[in-house]
Amino acid sequence: MKMIKDYEMVIGLEVHVELKTKTKIFCSCPTTYGAKPNTQTCPVCMGLPGVLPVLNKKVVEDAVKAGLATNCKIAHFSKQDRKNYFYPDLPKAYQISQYDIPLCENGYLMIETEEGSKRIGITRIHIEEDAGKLVHDDKYGTMIDCNRCGVPLIEIVSEPDIRSAKEAVAYLEKLRTIILYSGISDCKRNEGAFRCDVNLSVRKKGQTEFGTRTEMKNINSSQYVAQAIEYEYKRQVETIESGGRIVQETRKFDQETGKTYAMRTKENANDYRYFPDPDLPPIELTDDDILKLESEIGELPDERKQKFMKTYGLTAYDSDALLTDPAMANYFEEVAKHTTYYKIVANIFTTEIMRLSKEDFFCPVKAENTAKLATLFGEQIINSSTVKQLFGRMWMKDFDPVEAVEKEGLAQINDREVLVAIVEDVLKSSEKLINDYRNGKEKAFEALMGKAMGLTSGKANPVALVEILKNRL
């Protein structure tokens, strides 16, 4: 494995983001996800002879917003080009994209890893249409669903500044958050609205020349991106060290095996025979157009992070966790209007809400009731065990936690004399556990705590109980 450490990976990412428009990029067909196959098509998106595309203005506006949010320079003049290739899911046999004059160029974003902050350059952001979808079926073979043909995309191309799987994941998560806050896409990975192509090469450390790169297509999760990078890095190093040669090719990442497999030789730009689309006029933007779009972008994650840390006293870690979804950040601020125990609210989010809401943020509990729960814990009326129990119930059917604590007698036991008596009862019947603890077995202490908490139905003040138990032992 020593040879692996002699090499560094060089990574560039191409991220395809599906825009949240009601209609397609060049026609009025809807973009609803999950519709019956081939029911959202027309002569334009099917590429039939004699039709003319009309550019959806909102696609341009959304792309410019993405560029502004990622510190790009916005082009006052750009054009659209035909990218020619044959594939069954591309009815026209060309894709309308942008080649040499994209809408946005020379941007960047900052990422945070264990090694600190790093700037990752963004080469360009351009608009393009999506292709259809191949559906493989054992009975009928491969079928084509053209509903996705013409769905608007932006492609965000990074500079080859990324040097590890961790940096790649940090970049993807930061970019996704920025796009979400820009309001131009919901970035639902399971619907293909945020997917990534990974370009990777390796070179000896200290070397300035790039190696031959491979491209891994359409990976839709950060976890799989990391796995694909680690596997491909090792594969390329082992190939070079064994005297082999890296071939410039497109590879597929297999989620089940965690390996990459060759699909086809990687094309160069010349292979696509780009030329300006004669049916579409150039895209022209004025300074006023750009300023107007900039004013429509709300608070971005970095600004909001500073606010959360300064206003609510949260750590960078808690702030980042809350800011992964705009809806979650908004809900936190609603809760914060009704309590001053901000750190406790953040803990409820990271331990309970994020666990229960799964991938997309959702919380059926009123903000005021979540705030009341945080206040009950902050004022030591209930303990963490009761917080967990109550919030789980509130998630199923919302209610006022203050009333529940009073009605059900869930208040924490803080009376020291009562807690001392409980500890004495536990110790009387726990001679073996006492000896185990005194002989250095820490798990014995946990068992004693468990017995004491059990006697109080989980309502004892755990901090006070630990102190009393340790003093007694």
For each of these PLM feature ranges, what is it?
Residues 361-371, 375, 381-455:
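Strongly charged, low-complexity linkers/loops
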Residues 12, 60, 172, 226, ...:
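Hydrophobic face of alpha-helices
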Residues 76-80, 241-250, 287, 307-312, ...:
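Short coil/turn segments at secondary-structure boundaries
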Residues 423, 435, 467-473:
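A carboxyl-terminal module marker
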Residues 314-338, 342-397:
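Amphipathic alpha-helical "recognition" segments
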Residues 1-299, 310, 316, 337, ...:
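Basic, nucleic-acid-interacting segments
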Residues 20, 199, 234, 350-358, ...:
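Amphipathic alpha-helical core segments of compact helical bundles
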